[in-house]
Amino acid sequence: MDPCECSKTGSCNCGGNCSCTNCACTSCKKTSCCSCCPAGCSKCASGCVCKGKTCDKTCCQ
């Protein structure tokens, strides 16, 4: 189960270090923070690494 509500609400706050909007990380203080990602990454069961302000196709760990 996805720990974020991004798939339902389009936004989430994954702890104090990362916020997501439209399933993209909008504020991240560390490289590994948010498990909600764009459609291209939604199949990655192990989560994503934020690249700047978004999670890109290389988010698979």
From Swiss-Prot:
A divalent metal cation 2 binds at C6, C12, C14, C25. Residues 1-28 are annotated as: Beta. A divalent metal cation 6 binds at C37, C41, C44, C60. Signal peptide: none annotated. A divalent metal cation 1 binds at C4, C6, C20, C23. Belongs to the metallothionein superfamily. Type 1 family. Class I metallothioneins contain 2 metal-binding domains: four divalent ions are chelated within cluster A of the alpha domain and are coordinated via cysteinyl thiolate bridges to 11 cysteine ligands. Cluster B, the corresponding region within the beta domain, can ligate three divalent ions to 9 cysteines. This is Metallothionein. It comes from Plecoglossus altivelis.
